[in-house]
Amino acid sequence: WENGDELGVRTLYLDGTIADESWWDDEITPRMFKDELFSGSGDIVVWINSPGGDCVAASQIYTMLMDYTGNVTVKIDGLAASAASVIAMAGTEVLMAPTALLMIHNPMSVAIGDTEEMQKAIAMLDEVKESIINAYEIKTGQSRAKISHLMDGETWMNANKAIELGFADGILEDSKRGHTEDVVFAFSRRAVTNSLMNKLISKSAPKPEQKKQNTPTGVSIEAAMQKLQARKYI
């Protein structure tokens, strides 16, 4: 369980198994969630990555979020399965990562006893299922019969499927993607432009004149003078 702040919006991280009590210090309990949720005010973001857990504990957390006065944005970055999917339904807006999954199924329990006890357990599970359908119905607007059918089949949904069925509202976008692409494109375009300009400049620039070297083509001056002197005294 973690709590963080992001641009003035409080951020809660619901990461782990949902339980009524914490045994291994990595479970999320209603008491822990309540302490963090009401430690401040304003809009919140709840990141969820949980395989589920106790449906009663999940119901308590779901109710807290539904009753919260601020805006609640749920972001699923990994898995929102079983009881965790119920909590996700409390979001004013539910967003999923492109790689995230959401799973819904029928509630399960362990019962010991005679046939009468088994029948009581079955009746209890039926009522628990109806209560879970309530949360799904409020969020999705799907019929109870369709939701019940999806739960019977243990339905796994990627982001697109969850949006199609109304369990999610959108896909999380990478805020860095557009900026990065712009920078890369600008860099690439600048590099090409600079390369072209360098070529044009190098071709259009006047070539430096080379100094002409005077190479002797005949007799040197000194030799000529010597010859003149020799003739003078003949």
Residue ranges and their predicted role:
Residues 1-83, 91-234:
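N-terminal organellar transit peptides
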